[in-house]
Amino acid sequence: FIRAFEKVQAELIAEAFTGTAPPIAIEPAFNEYDSDLILHTFARSLTPEQLAEAGWPELKSDRRRFQFFLERAARAWVEAQIEAEEMTPWRGFHGRITGTIANIMRTEGRSKTLIVSTSGGVIGTIVAHLMGLSNHIGIELNWAVHNASITRLIYSADKVSLSMFNGLPHLDRAELRHLITYR
């Protein structure tokens, strides 16, 4: 199951299975949240003074300021302090992801190996949900997720357990470490 954006990536992953890969299914529920929309909606909720204090004009060139602003915007989104007609509310994002995971478990059944290719926001949300952590922690986990990392879930008919989070065993070699990135 993949988000719509990653069909080519899924095809490359499937090649590694040498003929045993399950069919690729595009699942829009695993699409990442729209961070640009969240950022701009949050920015519109601030006064000009608050924007200046946050360093709005320099965000594109200052990574630290950008990260700080993005974290504030994401917290406001999770707390339902910002909304826009075209923006999925946090509750909808969370429900879409957790509902889809539950549906996959039901429809696929036990003892299956499935691969879901998605992004940090989705992964952080799933991990926080499984661990009984707050929505804020789910967003915080998002910032920690490496590109190309592995998060492994083990599931049965009645529960899901986290087996690995943010693993990079496939990149843990000196000649590949430069490939370890965020966002």
Identify the meaning behind each predicted range:
Residues 52-92:
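Short glycine/proline- and acidic residue-enriched helix-loop micro-motifs
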Residues 1-2, 112-118:
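Beta-strand elements within well-structured catalytic alpha/beta cores of enzymes
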Residues 134-159:
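Domain-level recognition of soluble alpha/beta enzyme cores
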Residues 35-41, 128-129, 165, 174-177:
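Short aromatic-enriched loop/helix-cap "lid" or pocket-rim segments at secondary-structure transitions
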